[in-house]
């Protein structure tokens, strides 16, 4: 049995909201539990994610001799595509990596960081009252500097051995060929009608495709594999993020990405 266990949490976060809004709305809907209960036992390795395609990507990496870190990275690249409501390269991540053979626990903190230009009043309106939940979360001010790309890159440098080109292959194939939205994604999209679909590009991408394709995501992953995770924090990727965020009241600059 491989004596390595890896636990990875990837997510995106928002900051200050009204207390009443916290109970009224949440970033992601509960989609229920399945009545099917199965027990599976792994004698050599096991991969578990919330998406079968991500699980398959991780499993195949392990089957070909990859490490738990390699498997987690491959899975996260897929999840960033198929579950954008939950995680992605634009968010933050925490990783806990345990090597049982060495009894060694290693943690990685890849939480997003606030822009240098943010202030204590960042999420207050002109009347000095906290912004409402959706007012804040749909605003550029809710976007920090992504930590996930750096965490995945550093995790691979420390504990990976499979070539990054191999790790991006499942996600790139799905992005180019397309994938059917999961129940969780569809319910999130349904819940956000009237908000998310107000943006033309969001509407075209999420609501006008039964099979979702994302060539831009594939291109970013290829750049990640070819040039390393730091390419995410440089032109043109960083510039595209900054421009998009700052059109919606954000204050990101290249200094935040350096």
Positions of predicted regions on the chain:
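Positively charged n-region of N-terminal signal peptides that target proteins for export
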Residues: 1-4
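Noncatalytic scaffold domains of N-terminal-nucleophile
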Residues: 20-56, 60, 68-227, 232-234, ...
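Cleavable N-terminal signal peptides
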Residues: 6-7, 17
């Amino acid at each position: 049995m491989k004596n390595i266990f890896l636990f990875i949490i990837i997510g995106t976060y928002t900051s200050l909201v009204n207390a009443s809004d916290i109970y009224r709305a949440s970033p992601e809907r509960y989609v229920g539990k399945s009545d099917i209960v199965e027990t599976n036992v792994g004698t050599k390795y096991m991969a578990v994610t919330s998406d079968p395609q991500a699980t398959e990507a991780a499993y195949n990496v392990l089957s070909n001799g990859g490490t738990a870190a390699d498997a987690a990275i491959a899975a996260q690249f897929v999840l960033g595509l198929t579950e954008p409501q939950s995680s992605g390269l634009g968010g933050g991540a925490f990783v806990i990596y345990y090597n049982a053979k060495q009894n060694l626990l290693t943690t990685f903190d890849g939480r997003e960081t606030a822009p240098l230009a943010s202030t204590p009043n960042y999420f207050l309106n002109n009347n000095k009252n906290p912004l409402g939940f959706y007012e804040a979360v749909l605003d550029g001010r809710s976007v920090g500097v992504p930590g996930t790309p750096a965490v995945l890159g550093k995790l691979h440098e420390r504990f990976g051995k499979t070539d990054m080109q191999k790790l991006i292959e499942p996600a790139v194939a799905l992005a180019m060929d397309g994938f059917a939205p999961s129940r969780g994604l569809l319910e999130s999209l349904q819940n956000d009608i009237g908000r998310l679909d107000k943006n033309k590009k969001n509407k075209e991408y999420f609501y006008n495709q039964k099979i979702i394709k994302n060539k831009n995501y594939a291109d970013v992953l290829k750049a990640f594999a070819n040039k390393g995770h730091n390419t995410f924090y440089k032109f043109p990727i960083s510039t595209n993020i900054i421009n998009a965020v700052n059109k919606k009241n954000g204050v990101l600059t290249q200094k935040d990405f350096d």
